[in-house]
Amino acid sequence: MHKYRTHNCNELQLSNVGQEVKLSGWVHRRRDHGNLVFIDLRDHYGITQIVFTDQNQQLMYDASRLCYESVITVSGTVVARSLDTINNKLPTGYVEVLAMECIVESASSPLPFVINNEKEAPEESRLKHRFLDLRREKLHNNIILRSQVIAHIRHLMIARGFTELQTPILTSSSPEGARDFLVPSRIHPGKFYALPQAPQQFKQLLMVAGFDRYFQIAPCFRDEDARADRSPGEFYQLDLEMSFVTQEDIFNTIEPVLYDLFTKFTNKTVSNTPFVRIPYNESMLKYGSDKPDLRNPIIISDVTEVFRDSNFTIFRENIKKGSVVHAIPAPQAASLPRSFFDKMIEFAISKGARGLGYIQFSESGEAKGPLSKFLTGQQLEILKATANTSNGDAVFFVSDKKDEAVKLCGKVRIKLGEELNLLEKDCFKFCWITDFPFYELNEETGKIDFSHNPFSMPQGGIDALEQAKTTEELLALTAYQYDIVCNGIELSSGAIRNHKPEIMYKAFSIAGYSAEEVEQRFGAMIKAFRFGAPPHGGIAPGIDRIVMLLAEATNIREIIAFPLNQQAEDLLMNAPSYVEEKALKELSIMLSPSSRKIHKKNTNL
């Protein structure tokens, strides 16, 4: 018989009754019934009940003193449970093991929090003792799910003709939109490597090198603040790139992968392929966001023309100054009490609005509310049709400059969806957002900058770039850039790449980069493109966010084995940490006087 186990704790069935077995695991629960002691023994696979009887008084006494989470090895005989003690919640619930021997392999110290229930402990304590936290069933299962998802992704990608390749972790800095994590070079004083924010240039170089379809489960590093759906520091993505493809080819490749993943690992309804395609401008108007949650049926409308000649002076004057009026319908909300409308107004004001107008249409069709008296009967009918409202509905209004109105309407739409319980249950609603602006105005400098990925191909190519002369014309340019969104969460951005040096130089020059700067930052890629670069494109769905959705986790740290906290600290390994002065000197690093003082104090030098 094996030294530690003949079976795992999820295996034993009625067919094993009468067999002598050996199990090892952790003491999950202990129940003392006087002449019987029950231990729920847990391992990676499941739980088996162990019974200690008074036929062996010493063994039963020892079992009664076992600490939770101690590791033990039990030898015994499999017996059937009586009908009244069968536990249908466990795969092993029809049997138990009558213990004949129990060896304590490793006794546990007192626990900082309870392991055997799902009551949440303080997150700081959980992260400091992550090895204990990972024993909890829900979190343990999340990590197993993550492993299964990644394994299935590999299977799906290889089956579609993709080659898995690894790209460097130590590379050069590039403008990906976030701060880099820098690594000083000992051999080259004063120079730094950067951890990759994404394998962007390398995967494009692989296409130039003739690898037709590439993928990897890529670690990416960005010095960003934490959010509920974004871990600071490190994250993983399904990075892929394809040669000789159009935008639709990318869509047709990744849609079946996502559909397969979400149908395999959940029982929820998943959007049928092809997924809905929504141009960026349409998404911003209808949903007030480029990450729309399509479970919410509310669609925003532009009703500026309805109010242009209305008797409502505030909106009419706003329109004359260039503002717009957008309507957000509230289905079947007309009969709700005044407190509901006051609550929505307070919410809008808290988000920066000056107010929130509304009209209620009763079941009989009568218009009520603060703004109803300012519209004629004909204007009200046009409003109902434009805003897609019916009798029994209410409709809210926002008037502001277009960009501000769009953002606020999006927030009001989400709030209404929650307040009115409108979100469709048990489903994953996917959509593509397409035709993103190629450029945007930098909020800090007021100058033209890339809206998203600077390596995207502008729609219309070099001709479009050369013909756009004014700022308005430049901001109207669109890119072959796309996002995949699920339930209001952006899973990935992607693009058809700019593979022509002359277009790249022109695109960067408009954004204020000289040819020398482009050569310095992207010299390897520019050089490669001069030796025959295929048209290519790609996408990189975030694995962390996919697993988060599949696990129904509310925080991304719940699907990562060893995450950083919101302050980008690893409380278990005490990272980041101070290093000795000798190590800094070897890297030619000198701290500022204030940092040096703190450093000396913490390194006891």
UniProtKB/Swiss-Prot annotation:
Region (Aspartate): 200-203
Reactions mediated catalytically: tRNA(Asx) + L-aspartate + ATP = L-aspartyl-tRNA(Asx) + AMP + diphosphate
PANTHER family referenced in this protein's UniProt entry, alphabetically: ASPARTATE--TRNA LIGASE, MITOCHONDRIAL, ASPARTYL/LYSYL-TRNA SYNTHETASE
Disulphides: none
Any one GO CC term of the record: cytoplasm
Protein name: Aspartate--tRNA(Asp/Asn) ligase
Entries under Gene3D superfamilies matching the protein: Bira Bifunctional Protein, Domain 2, GAD-like domain, Nucleic acid-binding proteins
Chief localisation class: cytoplasm
Function per UniProt: Aspartyl-tRNA synthetase with relaxed tRNA specificity since it is able to aspartylate not only its cognate tRNA(Asp) but also tRNA(Asn). Reaction proceeds in two steps: L-aspartate is first activated by ATP to form Asp-AMP and then transferred to the acceptor end of tRNA(Asp/Asn).
Gene: aspS
Entry-linked PROSITE patterns: AA_TRNA_LIGASE_II
Keywords: Aminoacyl-tRNA synthetase, ATP-binding, Cytoplasm, Ligase, Nucleotide-binding, Protein biosynthesis
GO molecular function (one): ATP binding
Similarity comment: Belongs to the class-II aminoacyl-tRNA synthetase family. Type 1 subfamily.
Positions contributing to ATP binding: R222, D223, E224, E490, G542, I543, D544, R545
